[in-house]
Amino acid sequence: MQQQQQQQQHLHQQQFSTPQKQATNFFQQGIEHGPTPVTDFNYTPSHQRPYIQPTSGTVVSSHQDLRQIVETTLGSKGVLNQAVKLPKGENIDEWIAVHCVDFYNQINMLYGSITEFCSPQTCPRMIATNEYEYLWNVHPGKPPVSLPAPKYVDYLMKWCQQQFDDENYFPSKPGVPFPKDFKDNIARPILKRLFRVYAHIYCHHFNEILELNLQTVLNTSFRHVCLFSEEFHILKTNDYGPLLELVTEFKDR
């Protein structure tokens, strides 16, 4: 718990102006034709059985089944709202944990596609708009510091991987329970920080996303995070920053 608190980032916020109005325009490009399948891009099935066709109340019993549900439900138009719902009889913490890893892989892939455009020279600070700068606690016990966006994302991805590898946070053995505070003190900080990468991409690299024809993938992935967070009350309104209006648009679809 102490280590978790020491690693807590601080969001430096100045007076909020009108960055949401620009963000809403992103919604009109890519998502309106229906979602492109978004999956855990580093995931390879370990056996050769047909994918589960999930429906409301599908009963699952393993990490493998959970991952298959996440993947297959995203492949059909209009099912994101259903895809985030907890399958019947499944452990809520395990369901959230699987999605944390999947969202990590999605944003890792998306950011990886624009790294040549995001450098210490082009993005000397990790910001969404000028009103929102995200700081990182490089040295525990000392104030968080401003970093170039690529360095911030590098620290973030390594930190996430450390969380996933920690058996105290993400137990991998059957029957080992998740911490009682898993959703609020472990999952929420992970999703909150990953959300900041979406914010940086939307506010500073959306033109590159358009050039790469990845706008549908980005919008679908982002909407998936928003719907999942809303379903399980993970992120709070102030976590959305300059993308609050865009989040509202996606939720209402």
List PLM regions with ranges:
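Eukaryote-biased recognition of C-terminal alpha-helical segments
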Residues: 214-253
